[in-house]
């Protein structure tokens, strides 16, 4: 049976590179009716935390990468945390020692002072580890689905530690033991693990176990062509979630980062049947923040308005933004429809829509300086109030005609009149279309806001 795993270390938030690796594992498992397993590699006792484990699982869940077995739901080959599998590693290490394929090594500081196949009791006060014995005369070969046949000469490898002095396994030993007993058929991971693979193959061979099929995926880079890291900007799934990126948009972007597919904008779950590892690029790709934001905007505009409002409310709750919107009201739908055309993220949607949902909006400094403190602003607002009080039909064409009549009657620049009214209604100069905004606000809100702004203008000494 096809079985793939994603095995994060709970030492930080889920990196988008890790999320892409999880996605490719998930896609392959789903396409072949296999199993996708989550395993927590928490043998770094100093840095691993339960909090990060929870956040990693939450990020995967938010992305929609559901798993079939894992630390939270169990399964037939658990436990699914390495810290709960120490006895298994100890048993296998002892098997290697018994067969003289590994040995105890004693260290005094950084110096190895003793080796033996028997536990060195007389060195209890020293650091005692278990090291794997490399057969220097051999070569280690394996097939990589992306890179083809790989061959490494063992003479370039030193004996390496498999059990640390604290009794915990090293990474290279633990993953071999876990992947074997968890019956993992394929290991898809970043190419930064390629140098680890020969050591792991040596352990498989020593134990007489069949190794899984490997695929090492090129890394995601920053714009300076170095591995994507915090110095390039936010890199975690949580960062993008809190920035207002939709889960489906992030999945979509991660999928096209290296996977050649016949279209750019799509729902990843509808593409499961088309996934083919042979269409994954063997070259590293650069993470483009602007491209992701653009792609997110496309997803926002393609969503049913009801679904977008639900996601928007989830985002407001996540950020603790105080904006009470009722998704059942047509007014809410109308606001979101005109606002989403101007933005690419939920964060931007909050900024541009805020003034529609509250009368307690503030005027941005730019509007106050350029318009609110100008002498002619009072005349423009009075004329607008007079004109809109007379207007019966609050449709776009009538609203546009009314505004252009104000410009004509006052013999002022269109921009001056329109921006004065725009800022009066919404407190800012960048908004959805003015005609559309007035139509959505309706007569009552429009007049109330114009009068409020006029009252404020009168308090300025102009």
Curated annotation (Swiss-Prot):
Listed GO CC annotations: cytosol
CDD domains named in the record: GluRS_core
Catalysed conversion reaction: tRNA(Glu) + L-glutamate + ATP = L-glutamyl-tRNA(Glu) + AMP + diphosphate
Residues annotated for ATP binding in this entry: 230
Keyword vocabulary terms for this entry: Aminoacyl-tRNA synthetase, ATP-binding, Cytoplasm, Ligase, Nucleotide-binding, Protein biosynthesis
Gene Ontology molecular function: ATP binding; glutamate-tRNA ligase activity; tRNA binding; zinc ion binding
Gene3D superfamilies linked to this entry: 1.10.10.350, Glutamate-tRNA synthetase, class I, anticodon-binding domain 1, Glutamyl-trna Synthetase, Domain 2, Glutamyl-tRNA Synthetase, Domain 3, HUPs
Class of enzymatic activity (EC top level): ligase
Intervals of motif 'KMSKS' region: 227-231
EC nos: 6.1.1.17
Cellular localisation: Cytoplasm
Assembly information from the UniProt record: Monomer.
Annotated function: Catalyzes the attachment of glutamate to tRNA(Glu) in a two-step reaction: glutamate is first activated by ATP to form Glu-AMP and then transferred to the acceptor end of tRNA(Glu).
Protein name: Glutamate--tRNA ligase 2
